[in-house]
Amino acid sequence: MDFECEFNLHCYGERLCLIQVFDGQEYYVIDPFSVSKSELKKTLESDVVKLFYSAGSDRKLVFSQYGIRINALFDIADLVDVIDLRKKGLNSVIEEMLSIRIKKKKKYQKYNWTRRPIAEDAIQYALSDVRYLFDLKDALLKRIRENDLMDTLACRLDKPEFDYEKRNAPGVKKKSRYKKYNQQKKKIFDVIFRIRERYAKEIDKPPNTVFANEQLFQLVEKNREIEDICFGKPVPTEVRKRIINELSDMHRM
């Protein structure tokens, strides 16, 4: 099983956009936009084992969006960690373990999965992420047995329950530039960040489209005047004025 999701690339926030399923014989795609929450919950919280690859972000997304905790999930990435492959991306692992080279089309790496209908070739691209999961699991387990690493695997799988409540800091706050700020500058940054988030949600656009992260830093460092903010094209004039007024009021405080 695998998901295609929207992560603040084409619209605001994170959204589950497509579910890809392969049962070993047949392929299925589920449109979460057309399925009730109760049906999604019944499917994802069932006792049927679900093979994923590196499922952490997917688990958090369906929990934050639907309150669903994926049950009976087996993450193949745990097997990769046990044998310590140098490259851990799915395609690299498939090439290493199955000698199958997958050429991914770059145009789908930023595909807008919120659009309907989804193009047929995009669906085929999405299904390629589940095509080899059964074979990959078998090949990894075989190598683990051959290298006498079953005890290591048991220790790896005996880990704390997945923390659905843990929230990661926004990417922009992980930058060294932010970390070097004193408390006062961090406070100013956080206020401007929240203002941008609120308007991004209002117009349903990624925050970086409202105005770029670089400008956020420049405002904090006073290297850019509020009136000189360069807004993204999708931001309506009326919203631009409100943002400038709100930031100006904050600046005068």
Predicted regions and their residues:
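Short linear loop/turn motifs
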Residues: A77, K105-T114, V210-L216, I243
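Conserved RNase H-like, two-metal-ion catalytic cores of nucleic-acid enzymes
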Residues: M1-S92
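A polyampholytic, Gly/Pro-enriched intrinsically disordered region
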Residues: L90-K103, I229
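Short, surface-exposed acidic
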Residues: R69-N71, I100-Y108, K201-T209, V239
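Acidic, Mg2+-coordinating catalytic module of metal-dependent nucleases/exonucleases
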Residues: K103-D163
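Hydrophobic faces of stable alpha-helices that mediate helix-helix packing
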Residues: G56, V130-K137, F189, F193
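Acidic catalytic cores of enzymes that act on phosphate-bearing nucleotides/polynucleotides
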Residues: I144-M253
